């Protein structure tokens, strides 16, 4: 056989297995039985003339040929998707999907913005994935989505990152915390105050730790959580203070559960970024959504509504 005889179906199957590094998970995603999936991968390997995976114990690994084919598959499938979208655009159609992956912190405004976009473009089927930074970076590396919303673009990846909204970080405490009565608090004053933080690798935590380290302060971490809600509940319960995006605490400020501390150097001025792999040809739908993000954030109607620290 020759690689020219490989089918698009086989390439899609191989790409799924390479993405998950698991035949079982790929079969589940594609709604195929594992035996049927294995047959297609074996036939593709025969067409290539090289094994695509090595199996060591229960784990599989890409061979050199598999690595090369993975890169080719991404290019082929991306080009095909882009072609499909271009044809739809030329025909004046708004069909197909828009896949957006965003941080859990943005759940306070990105769904609202996506809803506004869908109202203007009812023919676009949108898929929203919400996760933490580590998961989003994994998805970005695999090019699983059309667009990624991040508070801090990855420095180790070749990406395009366009800022579309402010994302100030503030120090937050329970309303009756003694420090809420003070002004212009020196960062060093917080050296012995217990902090409730997001999980290691979180963009918010990275920014907070970097700031305090620059001021000679190593944060005293009492607890860490993978969600803003858990962090806020712990702070409201008096277990410590935290650093969060201002967009996440509007309700708690209004209800009197939490307060922003006046710490020197805060708020930390950050941005929200629309991110995609460099070299990727973004679809007309992705481009339209990015334009909507910029416009909505500029006029403040659907963008992140931020409290004043």
From Swiss-Prot:
MF-aspect GO terms: DNA-binding transcription factor activity; transcription cis-regulatory region binding
Pfam families, per the entry: HTH_1, LysR_substrate
This protein's UniProt keywords: Activator, DNA-binding, Transcription, Transcription regulation
Keyword Zinc: no
Keyword Transcription regulation assigned: yes
Domain HTH lysR-type: start-end pairs: 6-63
Record feature DNA-binding region, as residue ranges: 23-42
Entries under InterPro entries matching the protein: LysR_subst-bd, Tscrpt_reg_HTH_LysR, WH-like_DNA-bd_sf, WH_DNA-bd_sf
Protein function: Trans-acting transcriptional regulator of RuBisCO genes (rbcL1S1) expression.
Protein family per UniProt: Belongs to the LysR transcriptional regulatory family.
Protein's recorded name: RuBisCO operon transcriptional regulator
